Amino acid sequence: MDTPLRRSRRLEGLKPLSPENLPVPEVSRAKRALVDFKSNSEETGELKSTRVPPLSLPSPGPQPETSPGSPCPPLSLPSPGPQPETSPGSPCPPLSLPSPGPQPETSPGSPCPPLSLPSPGPQPETSPGSPCPPLSLPSPGPQPEASPGSPGPRQDADDGSPQRQPEPHPGSLQPHQDLGLESPAGQTESSPESPQREQPSKLPPPQGELDSEAAHAKEEVIPGSPEPCPGQQAPGPEPSQPAQELTVQAPSSPERQLEPGKLPPAGETVTESLNLKKRVIASPQAPASKKLKEKEELPVIPKGKPKSGRVWKDRSKKRFSQMVQDKPLRTSWQRKMKERQERKLAKDFARHLEEEKQRRRQEKKERRAENLRRRLENERKAEIVQVIRNPAKLKKAKKKQLRSIEKRDTLALLQKQPPQRPVAKV
């Protein structure tokens, strides 16, 4: 698809046309119909030639169609900019600068191929009498046709000047072919006499050659191909041809020898295909990452209280055995003094209880001793005794009797009691 450009950018680098050079709509339609009619007759003739499958390289846009008279294959270079036009007498291939502008077409009799870069838009065509093929790669803009009789290569002066494709030249006998539908990378349609394959290259031409060609492009004006008005749309590409035309190739055409400076290295073609694959693969990964983020952002729905009433089954709550408050790291001074006083009172009370117990034990022991002493005294007072006043009697007493006689302190008794006769012991 061609990106719509602003009017200021479309008119950039274009020279004003005189009233006699302005295209007439009726004449343009007649020329376009003539080109379509002749291209259809030539394409039916191409089906009868020998078929050799061409080698296609990845190109995001439609590729050029090589007409039956071209002995050189199309070689495509990656250039998004406008391409130069090659006239019949041009001995050297024009080099293209990267520009979003149109691409060239090679008119009949042009001996050298135009070089263009990969473009998603329509690609240049090689008319029946052209001995050299166009070298094209995808370019985002439409392509102009080269007019017969131009003495040298032509190139647009402004790299970024987006020009519309002019009306088809009467000498150009084939319409644009849109080959983007046949293959995702795009394939070129080879003519019966072109055995070479197109080779994309990303190397731009030297700066000196670009400057010289830009100067030539400013001076040259094609008399046979009028440029369209700003509001006029360029003719669109024709629908792609069947796959049989892509394989047609003639054995009698000479091989195209490319200059070493313009040969694209094989590594760059592989790199271009890898880059295209990476772009295609990277696109579906972006929505996948967004889906993962959306899943992570989903809020966790908390569970309600269990029917059994056991609250520890809730993950946010703990069991009762775990609901013990830990001792805080710091306590207030008043609380600390209160706890110290309580500990002191508890210790004093324990000591008081111990002393009370010891005192009771001591008092009990003293009572026992006192009771024993009083009992012995009571027993002595209650004894029945006989006072022996005559000591000679004691001498006459036998030893057995003397054993039973105990000596007592009877002085107090004698003084308290009047002397009486002691009762003899039985």
Curated annotation (Swiss-Prot):
Residues 1-426 are annotated as: Disordered. The modification Phosphothreonine is found at residue 66. Residues 241-255 have a biased composition (Polar residues). The modification Citrulline is found at residue 408. Citrullinated by PADI4. Residues 304-320, 392-402 have a biased composition (Basic residues). One of its GO terms (cellular component) is chromosome. Residues 55-145 have a biased composition (Pro residues). Residues 346-389 form a coiled coil. Residues 33-49, 339-383 have a biased composition (Basic and acidic residues). Highly expressed in testis. Also expressed in heart, liver, kidney. PANTHER family: COILED-COIL DOMAIN-CONTAINING PROTEIN 86 (PTHR13557:SF1). Required for proper chromosome segregation during mitosis and error-free mitotic progression. This is Coiled-coil domain-containing protein 86. It comes from Mus musculus. The gene is Ccdc86.
